[in-house]
Amino acid sequence: TIMAEQGSTPSPSDAPPAPSGPPPKVTTLGRAAAPMASSNSDFTEVPEFEVFGLTVPLSSVCPEYLDILDVDMMKKPEEINKMQHHTSYYHSDFLIVRRGQEFQVNITFNRPYDSDRDKIAVEFVIGSSPSYSKGTYIPVFPTKERQSSWEGRIIDQSGNSVTMGITPSANCVVGKYHMFVAVATPFGIRRTRRDKSRDLYILFNPWSPDDAVFLNDETEREECVMTEMGIIYHGSYDDVSERNWNYGQFNYGVLDACLYIMDRANMPIVNRGDPIKVTRKASAMLNSRDDDGVLVGNWSGDYTFGVAPTSWTGSTDILLGYASSKMPVCYAQCWVYAAVFNTWSRIWPKFSLRCLGIPARVVTNYFSAHDNDGNLKTDIILDENGKIDRNRTRDSIWNYHCWNECYMSRPDLPAGFGGWQVVDATPQETSDGMYRCGPASVQAIKHGQICYPFDAAFVFAEVNSDVVFYSRRKDGTMDPVRVNHSHVGRMVLTKTPLKMTRRDITDQYKFPEGSTEERTVLEKAEEYGCEREKSEPPVADVDLVLPTMEISLGDDFEFEVEFINRSNQQRTVDAYVIGSVVYYTGVTSSEFLFDTPTVEIKPNMSKKELVEVESKSYMRDLVEQANLNFIVTGKVNETGQIVTAMKVVTLRNPKIMVEVSGPGKVNEEMMATVQFTNPFSFSLDGVYIRMEGPGVMLPKSKYYSMITGGSSLTWTEFFTPQRSGTTRVMVTLDCPALRQVSGQASITIQA
């Protein structure tokens, strides 16, 4: 005691003994009467008998009691339940229906059912510790005199059989339920035993006006819930490319995989009927940054221990791989996160989102601002001579960025902010301590109401940031020398409903550049803390124009810079032409070109400067997606003004050819043939080819250790279509030296 009072440090012998053995198990004991149910796979046994003071079987006391002989879930694809609930495409052994809409079950008794004296209930249970008050235990009664939150009625009665209609509430928990049929007698309650064949899935229902995800547009609904084939847009603003993707929300096991992901997230069962909470949790669980979620992000170019993001063709392998291994899947970039999330919502309704029934679509934002600290400025630092200072330039502009939109009402926001919501699973910044983003109302983003949850300010900056060029003096002070208001958020694309074409939805995110509405929106965003660049540096009287080019991988080419003098006096520009190999995120991998021409331009004239680019200068450092970024900056000697221009050039990859035998018919074998020729003088090592087709072919892959320069390969695969309609067979080729080679063949399958 004296030592402690004097501030001395106790000796080691005075310290308490170190704990030994395993740490105590963390439980809810002491703060909750029972643990919160957070697993759809957990189940509490429901007693077969609940006897009222009797200890003998009911049959010995009352031989005429009503007994259940059989329960038919009417779950075949051609039967009424799956047809009316739009779930016929799901490959599942169980009944799958949607909430807020009636489905039917047929019950056979040992004698005719008598509504006057027989009391029955169909019971639904989800998760452990089922509770009526929490909506995880729901009894459904056949008479109007007694109803619960789910409605029930007798549709038909014939002999000993009764067809009962059951309507789940439009806000019930979404997931896998267990079903029982219970009969009440004067002596107690007897119910059916647990039978897995009577389990059923209940999904969100965009066809029901009472459901929070109701979408009152049949074409949009068909595209965003039922369509398996997606198109993801990438490339650059003036050179848009397409990537096909199989969402696979109906494939066997995908729905269970999505439910497992929610279980892995420990999401309370009672929250799984709220699309706001489901999508927010999903955006966190799709990445593995802080919760061992589905996908590991990798932008390094080294994919040694996994699959390159450009190699995936669909969501099925990813979701099933995660569910079976219980480990994050390697690797992903933004479009993979968006595509797999889109499956969840269509599944969860595609957990990947379509699978669960939530209308969802993948959206691409061209020139997407990142790392801007929550303000509305993307800063590019130049030295006094107008040359870019890469050591001090921290912000980046992605050539494109993919996210998701999910359709739902937003009762937590003022009227008018429901509808499409941005949800982004790519791990960029934390939100409430986790890597997730959204749901953020698209309408709130367009109108600058970025105070509303969730993460609207971050998305607003992605589409509205100004690109500000600063000139840094030797003393460290910086002056804005040019502000570009229109570069970021140049175009926002998604797939046109039920067509294989693109749809420009930029006007859903922002008002026209320079309009009165746009100025009002930016002022509103400033009120909520988004800082803008207020200065308006004078516009230089010399313009720079960079060309739009189509260049194949491995080509030599000329890069042309046009200087336009719009003044009545001669101008001289000391220019810097810098070419870099960049990731699609705008991050520089290496610099392959540096030229410093001095250009003299006569009054009201233009002059072109040609720069030779040899393939050997960029090929050795090329990264996936083969992007070259050209930045031209300079200083006008006569005025001291700074001129700038930027251009991203995506090199064209060689083609891979896909041919499919035809005509195709359901359940008749077909053949797909892949052909590829290595156009280079060097060999391609470690080549993977992947192939799949929605409704016709499950994912397949083939490995080639080497394809020598100038040689060709042919791969033939047989498959049997399971569904009629128009679809595609998609193929990707991937190796360390060549990424993002793809091809596809459209086919129509007859019934």
Model-flagged regions — what are they?
Residues 114-231:
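Extended acidic/polar, glycine-enriched regions
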Residues 208-357, 361:
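Secondary-structure boundary elements
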Residues 75-124, 161-163, 539, 550-562, ...:
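Contiguous beta-strand segments within globular domains
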Residues 170-178, 617-629, 722-730:
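Short glycine/proline/serine/threonine-rich loop/turn segments at secondary-structure transition edges
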Residues 6-7, 312-464:
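Hydrophobic/aromatic-rich core segments of domains that either
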Residues 115-117, 569-573, 681-686:
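Short acidic/proline- and small/hydrophobic-mixed sequence motifs that coincide with surface turns
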Residues 563-569, 676-680:
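Asparagine-centered strand-capping/turn motif at beta-strand->loop junctions
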Residues 590-620, 698-722:
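Intrinsically disordered, low-complexity Pro/Gly/Ser/Thr-rich segments with frequent PxxP/GP/PP motifs
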